[in-house]
Curated annotation (Swiss-Prot):
Residues 1-20 form the signal peptide. Keywords: Disulfide bond, Knottin, Secreted, Signal. This is UPF0499 protein CHGG_06021. The presence of a 'disulfide through disulfide knot' structurally defines this protein as a knottin. The keyword Signal applies. Disulfide bonds join C41-C55, C48-C60, C54-C69. Its main location: secreted. It is found in: Secreted. Belongs to the UPF0499 family. One of its GO terms (cellular component) is extracellular region.
Length: 73
């Protein structure tokens, strides 16, 4: 009986202590990326929707029902 009271008290104290301590916040939860007004291009063998999604020298091609950036030519 005495040990169960100790367990309950320990649980309640740890619960109160965890609520009282402030949680540490990350300095920057989201990274801000600036592409100077232009979205980043997709590299070779990455998914795309149109040719303009792909980097220079690549085009958007269909392979096995997937659209991928592939070399032109």
């Amino acid at each position: 009986m005495k040990s169960s009271i100790h367990v309950v008290l320990f649980f309640l104290l740890s619960l109160v202590a965890s609520m009282a301590l402030p949680r540490r916040q990350a300095q920057a939860p989201f990274a801000v990326v600036d592409f100077s007004g232009k979205a980043a291009c997709h590299s070779i063998l990455t998914s795309c929707r149109v040719d303009t999604d792909c980097c220079a020298g690549l085009k958007c091609g269909i392979f096995d029902e997937d659209a991928l950036c592939v070399p032109q030519g």
